[in-house]
């Protein structure tokens, strides 16, 4: 092991450490960071060399953060990235600095977004927050209005997690939805992601995603938002149901096939006569 460490350059060590951090399961960033810190044994190298990994993890995971002075959380996503460590809270129309290692928001300041699309963004946000409140007890959503390639675009992100370290499992739901505001009809594109880690007496992870496409009738802001939420609700319900049914099927078939139906002797043990068996006698005499 020592020989291997001597062969690795600092750059290679940081690259390996960064991969561990980026792939940390939901709710386990600190544990992975602390383990990597011990392995690398160079705090300055880790902080400077793996800073991009801290940021990438939070962006990928839709990390929720609370801004002091504001009631609701906002998600850290690529769509709200203003550069130089600053992010956008489109609901409260403020920018803020975000510490990717401490996961803290500071220095909130007024920020004027794209006013031309604000009425659409607000309508979708209102409908989306009602939907998230109903379906995700711990859910957070952030809705952006941006001009992308000359097209006014609405982007809605949802995050919901359950961290149960005492029960040896953590899980996170993420979904991202987009559509452009075009006359008559438009295309809705979504991606749904589930990641769960169970680690009591083992190490099992569920990592799943599904891409969605559907058409949306565009009318006024409020009605379009309602129709958009119908698409979101139907797709997310179908996905969650399919995941549950698939696991039930695996439990009834695949996992049963992995279990031996009979001992190697092909005969069942008569537990009422266990003492007559050699092992029973040995246990009795012990």
From Swiss-Prot:
Disulfide bonds: none annotated. Transmembrane segments: none annotated. GO terms for molecular function: actin filament binding. The modification Phosphoserine is found at residue 9. Gene3D superfamilies: F-actin capping protein, alpha subunit (3.30.1140.60), F-actin capping protein, beta subunit (3.90.1150.210). The keyword Coiled coil does not apply. Keywords: Acetylation, Actin capping, Actin-binding, Phosphoprotein. GO terms for biological process: actin cytoskeleton organization; barbed-end actin filament capping. The keyword NAD does not apply. PANTHER family: F-ACTIN-CAPPING PROTEIN SUBUNIT ALPHA, F-ACTIN-CAPPING PROTEIN SUBUNIT ALPHA-2. F-actin-capping proteins bind in a Ca(2+)-independent manner to the fast growing ends of actin filaments (barbed end) thereby blocking the exchange of subunits at these ends. Unlike other capping proteins (such as gelsolin and severin), these proteins do not sever actin filaments. This is F-actin-capping protein subunit alpha-2. It comes from Monodelphis domestica.
């Amino acid at each position: 092991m020592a020989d291997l460490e001597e062969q690795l350059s600092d750059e290679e060590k940081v690259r390996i450490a960064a991969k561990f951090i980026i792939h940390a399961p939901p709710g386990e960033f600190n544990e992975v960071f602390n383990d990597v810190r011990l392995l690398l044994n160079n705090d300055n190298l880790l902080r400077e060399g793996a800073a991009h990994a801290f940021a990438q993890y939070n962006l990928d995971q839709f990390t929720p953060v609370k801004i002091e002075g504001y009631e609701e959380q906002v998600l850290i996503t690529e769509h709200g990235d203003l550069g130089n460590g600053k992010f956008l809270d489109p609901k409260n129309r403020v920018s803020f600095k975000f510490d990717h290692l401490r996961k803290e928001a500071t220095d909130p300041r007024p920020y004027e977004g794209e006013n031309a699309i604000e009425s659409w963004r607000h309508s979708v946000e209102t409908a989306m927050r009602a939907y998230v409140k109903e379906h995700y007890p711990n859910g957070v959503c952030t809705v952006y209005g941006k001009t992308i390639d000359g097209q006014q675009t609405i982007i809605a992100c949802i995050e919901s997690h359950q961290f149960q370290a005492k029960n040896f499992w953590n899980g996170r739901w993420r979904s991202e939805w987009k559509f452009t505001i075009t006359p008559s009809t438009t295309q809705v594109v979504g991606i749904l992601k589930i990641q769960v880690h169970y680690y009591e007496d083992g190490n099992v992870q569920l990592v799943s995603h599904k891409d969605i496409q559907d058409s949306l009738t565009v009318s006024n802001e409020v009605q379009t938002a309602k129709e958009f939420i119908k698409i979101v609700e139907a797709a997310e319900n179908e996905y969650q149901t399919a995941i549950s049914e698939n696991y039930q099927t695996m439990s009834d078939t695949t996992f049963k096939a992995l279990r031996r139906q009979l001992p190697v002797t092909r005969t069942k043990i008569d537990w009422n006569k266990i003492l007559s068996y050699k092992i029973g006698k040995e246990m009795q005499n012990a």
